[in-house]
């Protein structure tokens, strides 16, 4: 099997593989601002910090041993996205598929698996250089999750950690890889003013997205809370910190998430949300969207005035046309009834 490094080409539309991936399992960040990350993840997001002997930080969100980790070495930014599959057989099938399409892939060492708190994993890169790890059997912690501040908890389970959104120079450079080779399912997409594709792996409206912004790197990752008040109280905290807020409170038009975005110590954003849309992957039909990214709010405080005005106009236009959607209530019992109906 090839070593980790190069990535082969997969022609758009030439191949479509079944998706073995189930959810976003973890996010790894590279940053020298470890103390700042601890304050951010624990004090604002409400994660639990886990003690580590190495110069790094790790954080819990649920019953698993870790969901977010920050490595103190390397260039500032995203280190890795970790995706979960069900079994070792799924890893073997994925490794064979990647190898057959000339994508360099390697099995992670036992030491790396222990560091990630998973049974086994594969390591490879997407066409734009993003490090991806795919694993099975994450380690369950031996004690309950203890949030860093009073929150009801995070919405994870079968839907995973949340979602990740990546900048790419052009969507065409990565779409064949994610949709064709890895089998990510398109939820919806927008072609104006930027090409943006949203993908699902489970009942969460999207676990991944590509934004053709002409840039590279992580735009944001999202964590979903168990109660709207968790988000509102986090919003209060974010507004008290200088230059922390990136997007004001608002509601997205495709996944119905009520959220705000906070700037991380590494420069990208975290979306902190509640009420995300639940879909039925078996019947969902991908479609183009035309109503702009948000029903209301989500003023992008970091953008130039001209760009903010354009997005504001899109929101006002959608409101004038009566575009809206019912709230999605986070109720495990109701979700189980929907699944079994």
Region annotations inferred by a language model:
Residues 19-66, 166-206, 211:
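Core segments of cupin and vicinal oxygen chelate
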Residues 65-69, 129-132, 205-209, 267-269:
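Short, charged/polar, Gly/Pro-enriched secondary-structure boundary elements
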Residues 138, 148-149, 153-179, 183:
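Non-heme Fe(II) oxygenase catalytic core, chiefly the N-lobe of the double-stranded beta-helix
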Residues 51-55, 61-86, 109-111:
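Conserved donor-binding loop and adjoining core beta-sheet/short helix segment
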Residues 2-15, 23-32, 73-97, 101-157, 160-169, 197-198, 242-341, ...:
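Vicinal oxygen chelate
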């Amino acid at each position: 099997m090839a070593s980790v490094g190069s990535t082969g080409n997969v022609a758009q539309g030439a191949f479509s593989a079944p998706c073995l991936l189930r959810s976003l399992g973890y996010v790894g960040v590279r940053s020298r601002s470890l103390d700042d990350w601890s304050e951010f993840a624990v004090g604002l997001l409400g994660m639990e910090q886990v003690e580590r002997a190495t110069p790094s930080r790790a954080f819990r969100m649920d019953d698993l041993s870790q969901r977010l980790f920050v490595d103190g070495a390397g260039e500032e930014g995203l280190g890795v996205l970790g995706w979960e599959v069900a079994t070792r057989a799924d890893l073997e099938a994925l490794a064979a598929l990647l190898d057959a399409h000339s994508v360099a892939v390697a099995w992670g060492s036992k030491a790396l698996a222990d560091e990630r708190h998973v049974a086994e994993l594969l390591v490879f890169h997407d066409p734009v250089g993003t490090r991806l790890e795919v694993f099975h059997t994450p380690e369950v912690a031996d004690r309950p999750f203890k949030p860093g501040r009073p929150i009801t908890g995070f919405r994870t389970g079968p839907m995973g950690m949340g979602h990740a959104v990546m900048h790419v120079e052009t969507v065409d450079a990565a779409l064949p890889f994610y949709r064709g080779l890895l089998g990510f399912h398109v939820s919806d997409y927008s072609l104006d003013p930027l090409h943006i594709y949203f993908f699902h792996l489970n009942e969460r409206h999207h676990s991944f997205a590509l934004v053709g912004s002409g840039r590279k790197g992580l735009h944001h990752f999202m964590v979903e809370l168990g109660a709207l008040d968790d988000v509102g109280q986090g919003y209060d905290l974010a507004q008290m910190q200088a230059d922390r807020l990136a997007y004001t409170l608002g509601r997205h038009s495709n996944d119905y998430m009520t959220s705000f975005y906070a700037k991380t110590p590494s420069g990208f954003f975290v979306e902190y949300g509640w009420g995300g849309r639940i879909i039925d992957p078996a019947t969902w039909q991908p479609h183009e969207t035309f109503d702009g990214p948000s029903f209301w709010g989500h003023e992008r405080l970091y953008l130039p005035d001209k760009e903010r005005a354009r997005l504001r106009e899109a929101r006002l236009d959608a409101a004038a046309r009566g575009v809206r959607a019912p709230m999605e209530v986070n109720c495990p019992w109701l979700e189980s009834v929907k699944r079994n109906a």
